[in-house]
Amino acid sequence: CPLRRQRQLCIRDRSHAELRPQVAVVGHRPTETLGRGDAERDRVIEELGLREWCDRPAARVSTCVAARMALAEGISSGAPVLLLDQLLAPMTSKWRARAVACVAQVARTGRVVLWAEHALDYALGAADSVVEIIDGHARQVEASSWSSTNLPPTPLQEVAARSGEGIFASPEQAHARLAATALTAVPSPQPQQPKGPVLARVDPAALRLSGGLIDVRAGQVLGIVAHEPVQAHRAARRLAATVRPRGVNDHLLHALLRQTSVQRACDMVDRRADRPVGESMELANKVLGPVGARRGAEHSEGQQRLLANVLACAGGQVVLWVDPGWAVDAASGDHLVQTVRRRGTSVIMASRDVDLVARWCDRVLVVDEHEVVADGRPGSVVADLPYPPQVAQVFPGGHVVRTADVALIPGSKAEGGRAHAQLV
């Protein structure tokens, strides 16, 4: 997503040594301790909530904090070009919105921002144009008119299309504009979600949590979220270990993919799970195409995450996914979820991305410290989520998390034309 290219920078006939000081590459970790210094760096530190972390080494902070530190370092470098690589993947939804605002502010100063990002639901609102590369062919269009033949629309694109608007840069802008045009959201008919058989009924005490019994059902995607992602990860791993004691450890799957070819990793996992050799490879080919001959480490970060999710499916009826949307494009992720659903597999997933939870999950457990504080459909627990999904921000107070949950119609001027939604 290129942002506001107000400065021309010629790179022809320049060596890497000449270009290096002109470009700041921002990944998931800073190159050194952030520290405090000039006014620009201090301002970014405040905006990204890094005051208490700026003097700590990146190795001693969470991945979300480290990614924000990397962005602050890149912005304060003064380089005329910022190259952002999947910046939002490690961040929780709350900080994604803050990071996008910081990047947009940098672009307004005239610096060039080139951003490779799969979390388009946030990044697209800050972009001036989008370069989409399909089968080696690049296509650049204005962000306001961009739509993809390969990727599903973002929630804000869907709301804009259904309301007759061009584009919304943020949920706040969408809410304000819908209210100003007297558009009101009313609930769409909710299809009855099929309830598969209960595979296990777990006492949360076994997970070192308090709360009611937790049902794990066949064909259901159960999301676990928390204010601190590590709490959700811990609860998901304990729940999966309780339901399927012989399941494959997700850390081992990532390590296996780094060390060998995809084909060999799939075969090894199939043998360990006493499944016909070739089943995991068949699923990987369905989701990613023919990838067996290459080593896992040769694939992109998002593809490695998808492959680990595929290998986890060898665990049987219950599958554990930890941050399954990390640097994964929406089309591939949706395809994997649909494929797993058709197989009747139960998925337990921990995620830091509340918009992904809203899109994929049938049920959500919200964990706070040592307690399950909410358990239900994504829309019914929206008030307890660490951060509201974008659709919930467009229609606050309505228990709405998906655009499919509502229909937009002209609102009553007697109600002030307020955009709102209500589920029954």
Regions found by a protein language model. Give the residues of each.
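Single conserved hydrophobic/aromatic residue that forms the stacking wall/gate
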Residues: 1-7, 11-13
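A short, surface-exposed alpha-helical micro-motif characterized by mixed small hydrophobic
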Residues: 123-125, 357-359
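Q-loop/switch helix immediately C-terminal to the Walker
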Residues: 16-40, 251-280
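Conserved ABC ATPase "signature" region
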Residues: 40-53, 276-292
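ABC ATPase nucleotide-binding domains
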Residues: 148-207, 387-424
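ABC ATPase C-loop
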Residues: 75, 216, 312-313
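H-loop/switch region of ABC-family ATPase nucleotide-binding domains
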Residues: 116-118, 351-352
